[in-house]
Amino acid sequence: MERRGFSIKTFESKKELTAWIPAIVELYNETFLENWEFNPITEAEGKVIGERLLSIADPKLIKLVMKGDAIAGFLFGFPDISEGIRRANGRIWPFGWFWLLRDMKKTRWINLNGAGILAPYRGLGVNAILYAEMEKTIRSGAFEHADLVQMEEHVLTLEDTKTMGGQIYKRHRIYERHL
């Protein structure tokens, strides 16, 4: 899919995705600079996070929007393994890994937990390109439902969810209390 000079970068293998991790970490840091709760990820942290996420990630659920050779935005999706974690009682050993692997393959839910667009490309429809491409992937695969985790104060993303016909059924808030 290409619109207004933007194209989608998809991944077929974890090896292919691994090569993009440093660029994705850099983009992630640039995208969230304006968020008050954000702490930049170092290169070493990015490598560790990337390795851990690759253990559960399906490369087809990681989407990048490209403007030429530059990354303009991203959307990450992960199979929902929460049922496997419940069945394993939160323990991997001795047999918890079985439930995690089983549910990773059998789940009908996908968690969309990580989306960002660089400031110069916001308001140009990049989010619509990402959502449309992810919807195609979800509908062509074994998934039936998607869960977008978003803070209540991120009004634009919540509006995007409503526009796409999504239903807001959870509120994620941060409370502060001085001790």
Task: Describe the residue ranges of each PLM region.
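Active-site/acyl-donor-binding loops of N-acyltransferases
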Residues: K60-K63, K67, G73-L100, N113-L179
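A conserved beta-strand-loop-helix scaffold within acyl/acetyltransferase catalytic domains
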Residues: S7-I117
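Acyl-donor-binding surface of acyltransferase catalytic domains
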Residues: M1-E12, R173-L179
